[in-house]
Amino acid sequence: MDYEINDETLAVIPTDEGKCEAIELHGNIPIKDTSLTVIEHSCEYFGINYKTRLNSTYKFIKARYKAPVVVEESSRLIFFPISSPRNKDTVWMSYNNILAYEKSEEKNETIVKFNNGYSMKVPVSYYTFN
């Protein structure tokens, strides 16, 4: 894999079957792997595997479902899935790059606004996102 999560990564979104795209501050980067694979690889790149990161999350906040993952501590790279991480259509969002979020006119969508002014609709209700 040739991509690691970094402080400019806003989200990792699925595209075609088995592929995704990293949404960054200054553009989008196509990736030939799933969004979960990007998260797993990035955890390992920064020294601790994904399952260990999930276990740490559970230990501290008792979250098992759609739990945030600290990809890297010192840079505060924290990502969370908007649905089950095993779902191939899951979007992973950067916790620290989100400025605000609001209800969409569509019932099962939320508009997420990032620190750089970029916004995107994600396929999850406002109540679930909140």
Description of each model-found segment:
Residues M1-M93, N97-N130:
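Eukaryotic intrinsically disordered, low-complexity regulatory linkers and tails enriched in Ser/Thr/Pro
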